[in-house]
Amino acid sequence: MQFHKYDVVIVGAGGAGMRAAIESGQRARTAVLTKLYPTRSHTGAAQGGMCAALANVEEDNWEWHTFDTIKGGDYLVDQDAAEIMAKEAIDAVLDLEKMGLPFNRTPEGKIDQRRFGGHTRDHGKAAVRRACYAADRTGHMILQTLYQNCVKHGTEFFNEFYVLDVNLTPDENGNPVATGVVAYELATGELHVFHAKAIVFASGGAGKIFKTTSNAHTLTGDGLGIIFRKGLPLEDMEFFQFHPTGLAGLGILISEAVRGEGGILRNVDGERFMERYAPTIKDLAPRDIVARSMVQEVLQGRGCGPNKDYVVLDVTHIPEETLNAKLPDIMEFSRTYLGVDPVTEPVPVFPTCHYVMGGIPTNIHGEALRDNENVIPGLYAAGEVACVSVHGSNRLGTNSLLDINVFGRRAGIAAAEYALGHDFVEMPENPTTVVEDQLSLLLSEHGNERVADIRTELQATMDSHASVYRTEETLKQALTDVQALKDRYQRITVADKGKRYNTDLLEAVELGFLLELAEVLVVGALARKESRGGHAREDYPNRDDTNFMRHTMAYKEGEGLRSEIRLDYKPVTFTRYEPMERKY
């Protein structure tokens, strides 16, 4: 076991983690722990753009952006946070430009902008060009740019260090204070304790709960699971976004930028069906609306292909030079994975799990909450692992790359300033006990269940029973299945007993997180008897502001996987926009 001491420890090296590290590292001694090499983080898979009301191409302002974010989130957005994000978006983009990010340019040399779903001018009157982009590799460019700047500032990275626990020390009133993390070094199997004044979780989402997902194999909700197991709340975990355009049968992302450049969704009759569902902005309606519309087309017999189980994305009317210049990766993905050339034929697409709107509840400074009001001193979160909540029940495209930059920066500054103003708090007497017990149990010979089998069954039941459309019946079936899988998880066997690069062991750990988070999702979805944003109940098809204009707060009660989930609720913050009917 090795001990380390830093002012600030950041867990995760994607966009939010590295943006926080740039700010924190210039103010306090900072370490970044990541289970992946930083430039392999999932931020690199984001394609379409990062929005800001620069008004380089069309008239725009941050207030319209705020309104679109709130309406897009079906009014479950904390409006103070949305205002901050929209206001600070402009500087966030310009900061990246100064760091060297190669944005596409207008003929005049300004940052170019394109249309994206749900982004409008003058409170919904027409689509607006707000997304700043670097071809269809915007996330990749952001990741590379942030990493270069971390290296420039001398950020200390601990690569392939898998954080498995956060240490919390009670203060004089018995309330938790963050004091460190415990990490497993993949190369050696050794445990490392990082004593810190401030900890920032930026560990990403949990899309691998589902089979059909745009998420990488590594997005297993580790940070969410660690926090949940400490008895701390997770907010709005029933709200998962299903991106409308995943490659059919695979889930690989086809960016919304394709529709922003003029791509059209069509059914088996060749009809542009989104004209029926969203007459004003059609294919550029928010993602939850487009995804549900696509599923409805299939359910009503208008799907394409031999099994009529997908729709198509048509770009054959767009010049080939435009496609190659602005959407090169999308062209390659379609040809490589489906054998379809978008220049000459439409691309088969269907919704794919993409993003979790919920997460660790935080305030606008990135400080993590232990209940509806009180923060945990020294604990911060940013990015997809966090819930500010700027996305409400449905995130708008391009707001995620914005979120990681705005709130990653804020969390990094706040964590460093907290660390500079406080002394180290003593860690628990045996900081590695929880992790040692967890790993020992997984490595012991106590069963014959395989991790891969349980994970496959979990993902299949979540795809079938808790995805785009849900009912009481399907959710109860999902809950029964997940709880049965949790019982089987107690009897798993890990074949590799070695210490070096034991990925079998870590996949077993990840599966434990996925099982718990799947249950949190289903329990929250069962309790929310309405349809809002990414949560669509066929048995409760309408939004119910009277009973459910509130954030779900899920707490773990008891120890181990057989513990109960307690739900509480937190009010939504309103500043200027009252809820109204959501039409596009």
Name every feature range the model reports, one short phrase each.
Residues 198-252, 397-414:
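Glycine-rich loop(s) and the adjacent beta-strand/alpha-helix scaffold that form part
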